[in-house]
Amino acid sequence: MALLQIAEPGQSPKPHERRLAVGIDLGTTNSLVAAVRSGVAEPLPDAQGRLILPSAVRYHAERAEVGESARAAAAEDPFNTVISVKRLMGRGLEDVKQLGEQLPYRFRQGESHMPFIETVQGLKSPVEVSADILRELRQRAETTLGGELVGAVITVPAYFDDAQRQATKDAARLAGLNVLRLLNEPTAAAVAYGLDKGAEGLVAIYDLGGGTFDISILRLTRGVFEVLATGGDTALGGDDFDHAIAGWVIEQAGLSADLDPGSQRQLLQIACAAKERLTDEASVRVAYGDWSGELSRATLDELIEPFVARSLKSCRRAVRDSGVDLEEIRSVVMVGGSTRVPRVRTAVGELFGCEPLTDIDPDQVVAIGAAIQADALAGNKRGEELLLLDVIPLSLGLETMGGLMEKVIPRNTTIPVARAQEFTTYKDGQTAMMIHVLQGERELVKDCRSLARFELRGIPPMVAGAAKIRVTFQVDADGLLGVSARELSSGVEASIQVKPSYGLTDGEIARMLKDSFDYAGDDKAARALREQQVEAQRLLEAVQSALDVDGERLLDEEERLAIAAQMDTLRELAGGSDTAAIENQIKRLSQVTDAFAARRMDATVKAALSGRRLNEIEE
């Protein structure tokens, strides 16, 4: 019989028993894999000594080519070479079409509106393309480390929603990787800098990659990383800089903007090379076709200024959400290859009033942090464990009567988290309840995003408001949501794992947050009106039900007419938009029915006690 070896508490495995785990930065433009070796977290090279793997996959009839050679073939074979696939993860075909001018692929819609890319090898989903990249990184790691991996920590943008996170986990599973945890990229950067520098205090993580931007405000204490607030833009990055330069070339050369896919890829490669050279040079010569011209760093600054300004706007909002002042932030960590652009570093330094930290290679810092966390989760870490506290980017809640959004877990709540809230029935004899799960910051359902619906059946028939339904929202460490509903008296229960088929459209998260600020006053007024309208309807139904049962028996005609008049007035006001008037009329109807309610209670008590002796009542 096989025996399981169990280490004593507090004892780390021996060096030769070290479990192999890696951190993976699955980026829009480039990807890396890193591991802790001899106590130091470092990126792992391929056979040629290269650390960075371009996030590019070229499909041939019988095989997939990943990395540098695939990216080099993008211009000559654009339809079979997939780059920036991270932008497609967890999205629907309609969302992807909005990026059509940036993505020269032939798309076809699959099940659940998922986009598929037509290649010579057949249809490929974004999940499959990402899996090919992850598989290449897994093979590199196992070759370098000399053994099979027990798992990986994979980083994702903090702004990735549930669908995008689930798509990332699916890609890892296809690649044969056990996901120890999905880790927000800014948090991974904090892990790297926190351990390397012993940093404490408030820190901003400015993460500008190829296709996404994240800003996170963290409180760092020894061994504890708490995300106070996050923000960003799912469609902002170095790719936009490249497109701006490409647009400038087209304008300067007097060319048509309607380029074929191959020419488009070639122009973008030229633009990217010019951008990278301008990091160290004041100006560069750009040549495309028969045209050539001089691109200065000053011109580049002008071209990218709108994108830099967008990132700074997100920074200010994140600082405001965190409840701290700009002056309190001690340092800014720069993450992502796009932060090498001088204008970006200058603008960030001016906003936060300090020189940005660039001690660790901005291309490597996320993978290094993920490797440190993977090492800890694999059980290799000695001494004090890391405590990572991520947050959810948008509030989660459900629909209540009147089309109102009731927030159960507010945005920027630390995860993992479970929150429960009790709700009740709206109508007498109600035996089922539809649970509508929502995401967003607005007060009305129509302004929020629907995540899922499920039904709770078997609720015992009761008068309205008597049943107690406890709804529990549970978000795990990967940011994935589960919702359950339970009727407390009967124990009937229903639940759902929220797995939407595609994610938010480009910029929708940012728009939802912006709208929540812009329409805050209007939303509160609309919510107050809906709440009073719902309360008015509830009261009218309750009074009418009571009148039908006991009106003739307990009220004289004058009392019935007085109540009816107040009910008519409330019905009329409830159809309008005067919140205060509805509230006042609810009070008047309640007052005029107080005596009726008291008589009904007396009659109920009298009926309950009828025929019983005093000693029976006392017992």
Swiss-Prot record:
The keyword Plastid does not apply. InterPro entries: ATPase_NBD, Heat_shock_70_CS, HscA_NBD, HSP70_C_sf, HSP70_peptide-bd_sf, Hsp_70_fam, ISC_FeS_clus_asmbl_HscA. The keyword Ribonucleoprotein does not apply. Keywords: ATP-binding, Chaperone, Nucleotide-binding. GO terms for cellular component: cytosol. GO terms for molecular function: ATP binding; ATP hydrolysis activity; ATP-dependent protein folding chaperone; heat shock protein binding; protein folding chaperone; unfolded protein binding. Pfam families: HSP70. SUPFAM superfamilies: Actin-like ATPase domain (SSF53067), Heat shock protein 70kD (HSP70), C-terminal subdomain (SSF100934), Heat shock protein 70kD (HSP70), peptide-binding domain (SSF100920). GO terms for biological process: chaperone cofactor-dependent protein refolding; iron-sulfur cluster assembly; protein refolding. PROSITE patterns: HSP70_1, HSP70_2, HSP70_3. Chaperone involved in the maturation of iron-sulfur cluster-containing proteins. Has a low intrinsic ATPase activity which is markedly stimulated by HscB. Belongs to the heat shock protein 70 family. This is Chaperone protein HscA homolog. The lineage of its organism: Bacteria, Pseudomonadati, Pseudomonadota, Gammaproteobacteria, Pseudomonadales.
